[in-house]
Curated annotation (Swiss-Prot):
NCBIfam families, alphabetized: NOT-MenG, PRK09372.1, PRK12487.1
Organism: Xanthomonas oryzae pv. oryzae (strain PXO99A)
Biological-process GO terms, alphabetical: regulation of RNA metabolic process
Subunit structure of this chain's protein: Homotrimer.
Name of the top EC class for this enzyme: lyase
UniProt binding sites for substrate: G74, D75, Q76, I77, R96
Annotated protein name in UniProt: Putative 4-hydroxy-4-methyl-2-oxoglutarate aldolase
Domain of life of the organism encoding this protein: Bacteria
């Protein structure tokens, strides 16, 4: 690893830091990329569609409005995201199939696990600004995540020499 979020925060004090309710569920704990956003409530239809498209090392940021009644991500959509080159997923909501998620080379951050699958009603909005955890998540802005936390920046940050402070 060539960078950590603490080092990026030291180097770029203007970045925005997400409040820390998120847990790592994926096989990758360090990931970054430009954001694609989804706003949905207990319906992962848009997530399923996006995971089937080329990810190009982007990060899917999902505002599930904090609901933990239904998991928005499980092993099938996550495996599709891996196969299509997504770097990671940040979910303001729940996930399931946690043992399988942990075995996949995908960053997955969410609030908690929930065994109940989503209801598919073909609802949700893509590429709209969303806000949760005290942070505005804007399509095309960059997300950086590791075991220390999540930060966002309007532009990509130079990662060269970002490690090594403190």
């Amino acid at each position: 690893m060539t960078w950590t979020t603490p080092d990026l925060c030291d180097r770029y004090p203007e970045v925005t830091i997400a409040e820390p309710p998120f847990r790592h569920f994926g096989g990758r704990t360090v990931f970054c990329g430009p954001m694609v956003t989804v706003r949905c409530f207990e319906d992962n239809s848009r997530m399923r569609e996006l995971a089937a498209t080329p990810g190009d090392a982007r990060v899917l940021v999902v505002d599930g409005q904090g609901s933990l009644k239904h998991a928005l991500l499980g092993d099938q959509i996550a495996a599709n995201a891996v196969a299509n080159g997504w770097a990671g997923v940040l979910i303001h909501g729940g996930v399931r199939d946690v043992e399988m998620l942990a075995s996949l080379p995908l960053g997955v951050l969410a609030l908690a696990a929930c065994p109940r699958r989503t209801e598919r009603r073909d609802l949700g909005d893509v590429d709209v600004p969303v806000s949760f955890a005290g942070v505005p998540f804007v399509p095309g802005h960059w997300l950086y995540a590791d075991a220390n936390g999540v930060l966002v920046s309007p532009q990509p940050l130079s990662l060269d020499g970002a490690s090594g402070s403190i």
